């Protein structure tokens, strides 16, 4: 009996209302947690994983690399790229897989569907040393040309930012590698709708029934995108038409170039000894004169016609077209000087 009464009292206790007395605090619950404490934290502006003991840094780098490529989570891909950028920005640079493997795996992110992933990938590219990027310009341009003709306006715009970076760090390699000159010009033609065949028809007959095909739609946002395309084209042409600065004679460098082992990969790429046969678009144009000759023959009429139309639109597009027009006029004047100098040299050689 005693035990049963005790159980009844315990059950009844759960339903009894507690009587509050003046001056006494309310009783604390059985599951009460004290949250009145204050936490202390240490903020570190910069830190590196190299300071951690017992951590497989190489394995961690490869894990971040795999996450950046294969993760289905957009946020995880962004965080992995941020961590890789930190490793590449550290001093000394921490890159256990090498730049060739890094680029091979990450270059498809140029056309990633998430804007933040593309932005963080561009930050990673900017952390790479230019000397390590130069041997891989041809491969990078292949992905850039794919992004330039993408259906998404945002992806095309971000791809142009990658091309701007490549021109900044490796201007000569960008315009002189196989396919770097004409194939990239073809991509600009697809973006802007400046077709060489249409331009030649306009110049001969004065009119044509051909329609202008462009990846840009008429809107304020796409107007800004087209202005960026024209600006990047001007930058690309400026790099291609830049006067070549002759190196002063150095006897040691002269003999080294003949007898020593080359220090750059594939130094005889211009001969194309073992590669597939190249067409005109895939050919190398290693000097300013060859680039200018093929541009005059194939692209000047189309670019001039496009610039005239862009100037008439005014606004940001018109301003960008004015910059491009200035580059074309400067290149034309420089080309005339080069031709005159060549004629003088030929005359002097003939007289000698």
From Swiss-Prot:
GO biological process: rRNA processing
Keyword set, alphabetical order: Nucleus, Ribosome biogenesis, rRNA processing
rRNA processing in keyword set: yes
Family matches, as Gene3D superfamilies: Leucine-rich Repeat Variant
Similarity comment text for this entry: Belongs to the IPI1/TEX10 family.
Subunit annotation: Component of the RIX1 complex, composed of rrm-9/ipi1, rix1/ipi2 and ipi3 in a 1:2:2 stoichiometry. The complex interacts (via rix1) with mdn1 (via its hexameric AAA ATPase ring) and the pre-60S ribosome particles.
Name this protein carries in UniProt: Pre-rRNA-processing protein ipi1
Lineage of producing organism: Eukaryota, Fungi, Dikarya, Ascomycota, Pezizomycotina
């Amino acid at each position: 009996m005693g035990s049963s009464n005790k159980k009844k009292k315990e059950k009844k206790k759960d339903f009894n209302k507690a009587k509050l007395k003046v001056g006494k605090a309310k009783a604390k619950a059985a599951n009460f947690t004290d949250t009145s404490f204050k936490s202390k934290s240490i903020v570190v502006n910069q830190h590196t994983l190299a300071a951690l003991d017992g951590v497989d840094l190489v394995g961690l780098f490869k894990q971040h690399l795999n996450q950046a490529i294969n993760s289905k989570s957009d946020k995880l891909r962004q965080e992995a790229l941020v961590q890789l950028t930190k490793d590449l920005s550290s001093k000394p640079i921490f890159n256990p897989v090498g730049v060739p493997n890094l680029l091979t795996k990450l270059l498809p992110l140029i056309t990633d569907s998430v804007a933040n992933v593309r932005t963080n990938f561009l930050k990673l590219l900017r952390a790479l040393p230019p000397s390590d990027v130069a041997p891989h310009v041809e491969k990078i341009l292949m992905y850039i040309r794919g992004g330039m003709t993408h259906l998404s306006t945002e992806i095309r715009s971000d791809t142009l930012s990658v091309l701007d970076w490549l021109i900044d760090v490796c201007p000569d390699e960008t315009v002189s590698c196989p396919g770097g000159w004409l194939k990239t010009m073809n991509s600009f033609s697809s973006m802007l709708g400046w077709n060489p065949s249409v331009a030649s028809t306009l110049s001969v007959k004065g009119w044509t029934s051909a329609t202008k095909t462009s990846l840009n739609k008429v809107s304020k946002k796409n107007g800004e995108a087209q202005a960026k395309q024209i600006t990047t084209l001007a930058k690309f042409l400026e790099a291609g038409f830049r006067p070549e600065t002759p190196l002063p004679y150095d006897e040691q460098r002269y003999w080294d170039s003949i007898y020593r082992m080359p220090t750059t990969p594939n130094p005889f790429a211009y001969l194309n000894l073992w590669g597939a046969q190249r067409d005109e678009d895939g050919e190398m144009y290693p000097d300013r004169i060859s680039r200018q000759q093929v541009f005059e023959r194939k692209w000047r009429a189309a670019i001039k016609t496009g610039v005239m139309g862009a100037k008439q639109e005014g606004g940001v597009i018109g301003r960008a077209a004015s910059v491009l027009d200035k580059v074309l006029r400067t290149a034309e004047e420089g080309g005339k000087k080069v031709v005159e100098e060549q004629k003088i040299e030929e005359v002097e050689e003939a007289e000698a």
